[in-house]
Amino acid sequence: MQKIMTFLMFPSGLEEAVKRYVSTFEKYGSRIVSTGKGPDGKVNSAEFVLAGQTFLSFEGGPHFSFSDGISLFIRCETQEEVDELWTRLSADGGKELDCGWVQDKWGVRWQVVPKILNELLSSPDRERAGRAVQAMLKMKKLDIAGLKKAADGN
């Protein structure tokens, strides 16, 4: 059993958000574990799994909101994976942010990051790493080819 779990308190839209997340990450073994309903019959709590990570969530009302202080980090293997997840998470009113960040329509912040970025940023060649950082700072959705090209000085 997972000892530490992420808990998300949604201001509204919990049921729709959970369904969207499970659908977005379906091919990674995602599912809804359980839901609870309030007196009004609406789903107000949920436990769900995204790519092996268990989340707990409540719909707490308008005095709750998400912030840049925490984000969900997705390590992507390919550009196709970056593109697909970026598109799904930014859909229907989401916002494309800088440096690989996207805010979904419920306000949750996600970092959609290609695995190679860590390799580029931790390069022992600090100039190469610096060029990768400068390229990343100019991007919204991260582009693997663009990051590599910049790191290589092209």
Question: Which residues does each predicted region cover?
Answer:
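Acidic/histidine-enriched, glycine/proline-rich intrinsically disordered or flexible terminal extensions
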Residues: 129-154
